[in-house]
């Protein structure tokens, strides 16, 4: 698998090699729901960060342009609220024919981001295939509109 899968340990955004603020709403080891570049949660609501620090991040396009990353075939994005920024920072890479499919977490309650994600992917000639989430989310009002959407390239 190590020759087929590459995990980016740099936070991704729409900015090229920038130090942006990582905002943590609470400090729990291994916790998600942090936000990079802005203090908003997975629904776009502002929160007061209990911990903040600058961290170097970049865009997908910077990684491919500088040959740090080869153009991927499949992409998975799950970042709790800045998915659209990552897509914006990867537009050139996502136009590449090598990219076949994207799985992206979408919160349908975060309407502006939901619309932005769909618009960007449509512009890049991606077609919606399906959306899924764990059955347990159906009973959880907080996450019942959060899905992993899968798109494929036309």
Can you annotate each of these PLM segments?
Residues 1-154:
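Phosphate/nucleotide-binding beta-alpha loop and adjacent structural elements of enzyme active sites
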């Amino acid at each position: 698998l190590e020759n087929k899968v590459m995990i980016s340990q740099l936070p991704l955004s729409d900015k090229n090699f920038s130090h942006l603020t990582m905002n943590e709403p609470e400090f729990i080891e291994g916790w998600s729901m942090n936000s990079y570049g802005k203090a908003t949660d997975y629904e776009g609501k502002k929160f007061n960060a209990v911990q903040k620090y600058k961290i170097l991040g970049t865009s997908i396009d910077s990684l491919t342009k500088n040959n740090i990353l080869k153009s991927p075939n499949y992409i998975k994005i799950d970042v709790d609220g800045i998915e659209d920024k990552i897509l914006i920072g990867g537009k050139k890479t996502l136009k590449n024919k090598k990219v076949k499919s994207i799985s992206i977490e979408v919160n349908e309650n975060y309407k502006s981001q939901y619309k932005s994600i769909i618009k960007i992917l449509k512009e890049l000639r991606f077609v919606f295939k399906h959306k899924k989430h764990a059955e347990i989310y159906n009973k959880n009002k907080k996450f019942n509109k959060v899905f992993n959407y899968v798109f494929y390239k036309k």
